[in-house]
Amino acid sequence: CIPASIDRLEEMNELGCCAFKVFISYANPDYPHLPDHELCRAMEKVSKFGGMIAVHAENADIVSNFCQWKKEEGIRQPSRYHEGRPAFSEVEAIQRAVLFSKVYGTDLLICHMSAAEGVDATLEARRQGHHVYTETCPHYLAYYNTRMDECGAFAKCNPPIRPRDNLERLWDHVLN
């Protein structure tokens, strides 16, 4: 779902679409990030027909500025890529998406969660009876940031692969 398609959500639902992915961080020019007011608008529309919003959760402002700062500092090592996309930017975006989903009663999926702390916001919302779901990816459970120096660009993804302690906490959430 991009800003230009928000007015067509009902039409897309009638054609069989029941879930819509949004980027609340920068993705690329073809899939611009959805500003908060547009995310709220999309959630309001989707909640009316019982659909789901799936969110790529990273704070666009933090990520774009931190990435720029890291480049200016000369940080180029793959193992330090996560510093330009800090875990707190993912956690904040998750908390914001959860808040909006509570306001509008929209089912929410947090896509490819990499920050273990982000799970807490979703668990609390579920305890309160909200339909908030999460998924992670195998690479977040198998690799930690220092392995990126071996793998190089093959391991570059967003949200990024994080330090080892995060991997261990993410596994704790998966197993419990």
Predicted regions and their residues:
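Histidine/acidic residue-rich metal-binding segments in metalloenzymes
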Residues: 4-176
